[in-house]
């Protein structure tokens, strides 16, 4: 049962990171936030360097590959976010759940029982309801109607370009699911300290190379942004918990994926109290459906 609480901790910290990232982005650019909190996170795991040696050579390559997968996933995600309507991302969380479940069942031989399948369907339903509000729920929860954008103010968009960035966004979700799958495989042969130290070292290296090649401007004032420091601490603690959970033989990728969706509870409450977002009652209703799915999934 310990792995369930570790993954739950990861999920709650993941939701908190989303709030901290939004706060951090109010002051600094996307790349400044990504690079600085990755560098700070690496500095926080440097004390683990003494326990990070002794791996077979092939595992350095595998961890470098995992770091590259996440590096590409984040680049794809942020590029697509800049160019697509917000509504397009309604299926993103859902697609991550489906991708991770597919990998766990097909490549790790995990089985989905009736309760797990019911839990998966409830989680998917809750996530979809968060993104696409049906008229009946608009009336029950007194939700605000979306304000239509006049056609004259809409930005012209090429269908081919839009399709390209939709594919980029979905590939990003697939890569994130693949990273979780790789964690489960790697933790059978390496320790959490080894994986976290080398993963962070490779990830920082990729970002430094990217910034140098693209000649991105990074202001040193970014290190005065307290949200970035908080983001780094939550990133390190959350990943450590997730790596340890992956190293436990009884943990299952399919169930872990459901538990990670607990992050939505944090983002909903944080959005209400920190950013004064509306429709909180409806979002909590959706969150409880997701929570019910998570509970069924771990039974």
PLM region descriptions:
Residues 1-8, 98-174, 281-299:
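Juxtamembrane helix-loop boundary signature in multi-pass membrane transporters
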Residues 2-9, 36, 46-76, 93, ...:
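Loop-to-transmembrane-helix transition segments
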Residues 5, 9, 36-40, 65-68, ...:
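Hydrophobic residues within alpha-helical transmembrane segments
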Residues 12-40, 178-202, 250-255:
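Juxtamembrane helix-loop-helix junctions in multi-pass membrane proteins
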Residues 26-32, 76-92, 188-195, 240-262:
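Structural motif at transmembrane-helix junctions in multi-pass transporters
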Residues 39-44, 92-106, 202-206, 238-241, ...:
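Alpha-helical transmembrane segments of compact multi-pass small-molecule transporters, enriched
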